[in-house]
Amino acid sequence: ALWKDVLKKIGTVALHAGKAAFGAAADTISQGGS
């Protein structure tokens, strides 16, 4: 079904966005945390 492909695509985009946001947050914390 088409909606399954849509949900899968949204999930993939969300996963990549989450990884990018987490990576940016980790970089910020490691650089200026302490």
Swiss-Prot record:
InterPro entries, per database record: Dermaseptin_dom
Keywords: Amphibian defense peptide, Antimicrobial, Secreted
GO biological process, one term: defense response
UniProt subcellular location: Secreted
Distribution of this protein across tissues and organs: Expressed by the skin glands.
GO cellular component, one term: extracellular region
Disulfide bonds, paired cysteine numbers: none
Pfam families per the UniProt record, alphabetical: DD_K
Bilayer-spanning residue ranges: none
General function of this protein: Has antimicrobial activity.
Family, similarity comment: Belongs to the frog skin active peptide (FSAP) family. Dermaseptin subfamily.
Name of the protein described by the UniProt record: Dermaseptin-H5
Organism of origin: Pithecopus hypochondrialis
